[in-house]
From Swiss-Prot:
The keyword Iron applies. Residues 2-146 form the Globin domain. Heme b binds at residues 63, 92. The keyword Nucleotide-binding does not apply. This is Hemoglobin subunit beta. GO terms for molecular function: haptoglobin binding; heme binding; metal ion binding; organic acid binding; oxygen binding; oxygen carrier activity; peroxidase activity. It comes from Francolinus pondicerianus (Grey francolin). One of its GO terms (biological process) is hydrogen peroxide catabolic process. The gene is HBB.
């Protein structure tokens, strides 16, 4: 994947403003609420019976932070995303059996969360760079699938 200097700047500039815990928790909660079939991968998280329960669930918050923290690894390694997510791809494919389509869904939700939090900074050019990034990350995570 080729990144222009402008794309890199737009991605890293916005990322520097992201509250990983807050945005990560919101993104994962939205995934579980908007696409309820994804909840089956999180059965061990306890009560996911309603949007209120999901939004208040400490395990959802913690895992959302973990997910977005690893997304930060993509931002730090824009030129090597495939290798950066190699082990996570294996884990989600071989052990967790997560449908790779869910990575795309989470990426789309992350775009919505970023737009909501940073509306002034989230210009069309910024959105285009982030759409490219979430697409590349989703592809890297789906790489180990057969």
């Amino acid at each position: 994947v080729h990144w222009t200097a402008e794309e890199k700047q737009l991605i890293t500039g916005l990322w520097g403003k992201v509250n990983v815990a807050e945005c990560g928790a919101e993104a994962l909660a939205r995934l579980l609420i908007v696409y309820p079939w994804t909840q089956r991968f999180f059965a061990s998280f306890g009560n996911l019976s309603s949007p209120t329960a999901i939004l208040g669930n400490p395990m959802v918050r913690a895992h959302g932070k973990k997910v977005l923290t690893s997304f930060g690894d993509a931002v730090k390694n824009l030129d090597n995303i495939k290798n950066t997510f190699s082990q996570l791809s294996e884990l989600h494919c071989d052990k967790l059996h997560v449908d790779p389509e869910n990575f795309r869904l989470l990426g789309d939700i992350l775009i919505i969360v970023l737009a909501a939090h940073f509306s002034k900074d989230f210009t069309p050019d910024c959105q285009a760079a982030w759409q490219k990034l979430v697409r590349v990350v989703a592809h890297a995570l789906a790489r180990k699938y057969h």
